[in-house]
Amino acid sequence: MIKNCIRLTVSAILSALISACATSPEQSLYDEIGGHKTLNTIYGVAITRIYTDPVIGHYFKGVPKKHLRDQLVLQTCELIGGPCEYDGKSMVESHKDLNIKEREFYILVEYVQGAMRDVGLTYQQENRILKKLAPIKYETVYL
């Protein structure tokens, strides 16, 4: 009886140790921020501001807001670990011949950042998203 009790105790301890060592899959940034709904809100807010901006608004004339929002959501979703697959034009193709200046690019970034704050993202989440989006600058500025 004592042997069985010892075996059960050892077995329980080993089971607990093995369970503690098992790693659960890390939550994606996409899921952490609230997924598609949050991205849709962020870009909806940012686009409203961008389209009326006196410096960069002219770049978006003729581009339907919903189309732009959908493309930005898809692209960001894919970059931050969501289930989406961006299938739009390449950034180089979409921005060629626009002569976007670095200053203009950062105006857009500020609107997106502001929208992230407005929906309640933490600075850490905001910075992690911006880090994923940062390479886009080199595909859009001065092309």
Write out the residue ranges for each language-model feature:
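Globin-like tetrapyrrole-binding proteins
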Residues: 22-143
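C-terminal motif of bacterial Sec signal peptides marking the signal peptidase cleavage site
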Residues: 17-20
